[in-house]
């Protein structure tokens, strides 16, 4: 039970983190002068 919960939460955190990184990278490459995320 606990291991499944931990793995699920890790997957969710990783997916959100990677999505944020990709969005941030695209935003920087497209708008270098823009500072807001």
Curated annotation (Swiss-Prot):
Record-linked Pfam families: YnaM
Superkingdom classification of source: Bacteria
Keywords assigned: Cell inner membrane, Cell membrane, Membrane, Transmembrane, Transmembrane helix
Compartment list: Cell inner membrane
GO cellular component: plasma membrane
Keyword field contains GTP-binding: no
Induction remark: Expressed approximately equally in exponential and stationary phases (at protein level).
InterPro entries listed in its UniProt record: YnaM_YnfT
TM ranges: 4-24
Protein name according to UniProt: Protein YnaM
Natural source organism: Escherichia coli (strain K12)
Gene: ynaM
């Amino acid at each position: 039970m606990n291991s499944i919960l931990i793995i699920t939460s890790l997957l969710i955190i990783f997916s959100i983190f990677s999505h944020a990184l990709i969005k941030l990278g695209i935003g920087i490459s497209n708008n270098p002068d823009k500072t807001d995320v």
